[in-house]
C-alpha cells in the first residue's frame, strides 16, 4: 500500500480502501438497506465503469444481507425523479434519470450474476 504524502513532518499516514468489487458490494448492501439516491447513483457510476462484476457479486453473496448474489428484485423501484434531482443536482451534473440509473444497474448485475446462477 503506498504512503499518503504528509503535509507536515508527521509519521507517514496509511489509508486502507476497499477494492472496486468490495466497494460495489458494499454500495449494493447500502442500497438494500436504505435505497438512497446517492447509493443508486454510485452503483450506476460503478456499472458504467465495469465494476458490477462477478467478483463483486460473489462478495455481496458472501458478506451481504441476502446470502446470495444481487437479483433483479433488489432493483425494482427507482427513486422519485424529483427526489433524485433534489438530492443530487447540487452535487454534480446529472446526465441520467433515476429510472435509467436503476435499469442500468439492474442490467449490469443481471449480466454479472448470470454465470453464478445459470448451470454451466
Regions found by a protein language model. Give the residues of each.
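Structured mid-to-C-terminal alpha-helical surface segments
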Residues: 1-120
Amino acid at each position: 500500500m503506498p504512503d499518503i504524502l504528509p503535509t507536515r513532518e508527521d509519521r507517514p499516514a496509511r489509508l486502507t480502501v476497499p477494492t472496486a468489487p468490495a466497494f460495489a458490494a458494499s454500495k449494493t448492501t447500502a442500497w438494500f438497506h436504505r435505497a438512497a439516491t446517492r447509493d443508486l447513483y454510485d452503483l450506476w457510476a460503478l456499472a458504467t465503469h465495469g465494476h458490477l462484476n462477478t467478483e463483486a457479486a460473489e462478495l455481496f453473496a458472501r458478506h451481504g444481507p441476502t446470502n446470495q448474489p444481487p437479483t433483479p428484485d433488489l432493483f425494482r423501484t427507482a427513486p422519485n425523479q424529483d427526489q433524485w434531482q433534489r438530492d443530487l443536482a447540487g452535487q454534480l451534473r446529472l446526465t441520467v434519470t433515476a429510472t435509467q440509473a436503476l435499469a442500468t444497474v439492474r442490467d449490469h448485475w443481471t449480466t454479472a450474476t448470470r454465470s453464478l446462477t445459470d448451470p454451466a
